A protein has these predicted regions:
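Short, active-site-adjacent cap segments at secondary-structure transitions
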Residues: 3-5, 77, 118
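Divalent metal-coordination and catalytic microenvironments
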Residues: 23, 35, 73, 110, ...
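Catalytic pocket-lining loop regions of alpha/beta-barrel enzymes
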Residues: 1-70, 126-131
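Short acidic/histidine-rich active-site segments
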Residues: 66-88
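Mid-to-C-terminal alpha-helical segments outside catalytic/metal-binding sites
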Residues: 91-131
Length: 131
């Protein structure tokens, strides 16, 4: 989390791979801009639902719809009301509900956008169909 400069220096030197995902993105707007300017996807975990994560929600708002993902980061970082318990994939729905509120869109629209991004990124998994 404190290695932004080093991470971006390495990616710049080696070339940012197509479809790079910043897993469990926890930076603020400045870090989001640096990643988005390099064509990366940002993936938000339950942290975005925490009361003290205003900067992270501001960073999420910078993310274009076609480069936005949500994730669990199981078994850690469960969103409220599950905070303090083991995180699980089912809780991604809560993270997506908060994401929809942040973006001012319906849960269905937010879920459709993030699902489409997942399908584009991970086409082999998408070919298996919904789980």
């Amino acid at each position: 989390r404190d290695a932004w400069d080093e991470t971006l220096d390495i990616l710049d030197a080696e070339g940012v791979p197509t479809n790079t995902v910043m897993h469990c993105f926890s930076g603020g707007p400045a870090e989001a801009k640096l990643c988005l300017d390099r064509g990366m996807f940002l993936s938000f975990s339950g942290i975005v639902t925490f009361k003290n994560a205003a900067d992270l929600r501001d960073a999420a708002l910078m993310c274009p719809e076609d480069r936005l993902l949500v994730e669990t980061d199981s078994p850690y970082l469960a969103p409220p009301p599950h905070r303090g318990r083991r995180n699980e994939p089912a809780y991604t729905a809560h993270t997506a509900k908060v994401g929809a509120e942040v973006f001012g869109v319906s849960y269905e629209a937010f879920a459709a956008a993030t699902s489409a991004n997942f399908d584009r990124l991970f086409s082999k998994a998408a070919a298996w169909g919904p789980v």
